[in-house]
Amino acid sequence: MQNKIQGVYLVTDRPLCLHHKLEEVVQMAASGGVSLVQLREKDSTSREFLELAIHLKFILSPFQVPLLINDRVDLCLASGADGVHLGQTDLPWLEARRILGKDAIIGLSIETKEDFATLTKEDPNPQLEYLAVSPVFDTPTKTNTKEALGLAGVRWLKEKTDIPVVAIGGINISNAKDVIGAGADMIAVVSAICSAKNPKEATVALRNQF
């Protein structure tokens, strides 16, 4: 599944969907060529989240775009999603792999050099589909992260691992090319697509930065 880890990665945020419903944003992003979608709705109840995940999986299926679930391995299983994105305080990735199986897409946030050192100490060859440099730039969509790692952080992680590198945090059309140039295999965005008047065109524009 690592060949899917390239291009544009949409991370959802309903309050930032200023011009369209979230489901419409996801469909337009898929038609614009988004490679991966992560459902990340922290304020939803488990029932709401599950219903939305099932709906998004249905929307994305014709486009063959995988759907990942933020944090919740149980809701990934229940919804039939393709995998999970895990933060440093979530379920350990090895447990997620044991539960979800070898074919699931599992990505892990790397917020500090210490995070990477701990990961590779536990397993020198972690079976993860991607590592996410988070955040690259300061971003209002996620306030519980460490200090921004910048382009230097992207370069550093790319040099350290053969696992595909996803860059997330404050990425938009004005800086995407620099992030890709620093070594990101995939750029993850929130407001750059969710808040766009035309999410399809926004997705195409970001894809064209590669």
Curated annotation (Swiss-Prot):
GO MF term (any one): thiamine-phosphate diphosphorylase activity
Keywords of this entry: Magnesium, Metal-binding, Thiamine biosynthesis, Transferase
Cofactor note: Binds 1 Mg(2+) ion per subunit.
Catalyzed reaction equations: 2-[(2R,5Z)-2-carboxy-4-methylthiazol-5(2H)-ylidene]ethyl phosphate + 4-amino-2-methyl-5-(diphosphooxymethyl)pyrimidine + 2 H(+) = thiamine phosphate + CO2 + diphosphate; 2-(2-carboxy-4-methylthiazol-5-yl)ethyl phosphate + 4-amino-2-methyl-5-(diphosphooxymethyl)pyrimidine + 2 H(+) = thiamine phosphate + CO2 + diphosphate; 4-methyl-5-(2-phosphooxyethyl)-thiazole + 4-amino-2-methyl-5-(diphosphooxymethyl)pyrimidine + H(+) = thiamine phosphate + diphosphate
EC number, as in UniProt: 2.5.1.3
Binding of Mg(2+), residues: D71, D90
Binding site for 2-[(2R,5Z)-2-carboxy-4-methylthiazol-5(2H)-ylidene]ethyl phosphate: T139, P140, T141, G170, V190, S191
Species: Leptospira biflexa serovar Patoc (strain Patoc 1 / ATCC 23582 / Paris)
Protein's UniProt name: Thiamine-phosphate synthase
Recorded metabolic or biological pathway in which this protein acts: Cofactor biosynthesis; thiamine diphosphate biosynthesis; thiamine phosphate from 4-amino-2-methyl-5-diphosphomethylpyrimidine and 4-methyl-5-(2-phosphoethyl)-thiazole: step 1/1
Positions of 4-amino-2-methyl-5-(diphosphooxymethyl)pyrimidine binding: Q38, L39, R40, E41, K42, N70, S109, K142
Function per UniProt: Condenses 4-methyl-5-(beta-hydroxyethyl)thiazole monophosphate (THZ-P) and 2-methyl-4-amino-5-hydroxymethyl pyrimidine pyrophosphate (HMP-PP) to form thiamine monophosphate (TMP).
A GO BP annotation: thiamine biosynthetic process
Cofactor: Mg(2+)
Name of the gene: thiE
One Gene Ontology term, aspect cellular component: cytoplasm
Domain of life: Bacteria
Protein family according to the UniProt entry: Belongs to the thiamine-phosphate synthase family.
InterPro entries: Aldolase_TIM (IPR013785), ThiamineP_synth_sf (IPR036206), ThiamineP_synth_TenI (IPR022998), TMP_synthase (IPR034291)
